[in-house]
Design a protein with these regions (language model features):
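Charge-dense, helix-prone N-terminal extensions
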Residues: 1-118
Length: 118
């Protein structure tokens, strides 16, 4: 999936900016990352308020092999696979994207800013 396809997919949601990240893309709205594309698969930001929708669809989280991890250990991120039907349903994708953006905003508020040592 390329950057043009990502912008096209989210047209009903509004303007997005795909940025290259590793072997995929981070998808941003007004500077906030709310989705990622890895291995041609779309993942949306999830939190405790939106997780049930992903679970009801039988979707799972984005995982990756942690650098230097032993025993095949994988890291789990708070981005969950979007249901495949959303690729062909722009209005429904827009609704899921709004929820993902809201989850990203809630997550950003919880992350404390590092304190500076003097």
């Amino acid at each position: 999936m390329d950057a043009d396809r990502i912008v096209e997919m989210f047209a009903a949601f509004g303007p997005v900016v795909p940025r290259r990240m590793f072997s995929g893309f981070g998808v941003f709205s007004d500077g906030t990352m709310f989705a990622l594309v890895a291995r041609d698969t779309l993942y949306l930001k999830a939190d405790t308020q939106t997780l049930a929708a992903f679970e009801a669809e039988g979707q799972g989280p984005f995982t990756y092999a942690a650098k230097g991890a032993k025993g095949g250990k994988r890291s789990i991120m708070s981005y969950w696979r979007a249901p495949d039907r959303l690729y062909d349903e722009p209005d429904e994708l827009a609704a899921w994207a709004r929820d993902a953006l809201a989850a990203a905003h809630r997550s950003a508020r919880k992350t404390p800013k590092p304190t500076r040592k003097r």
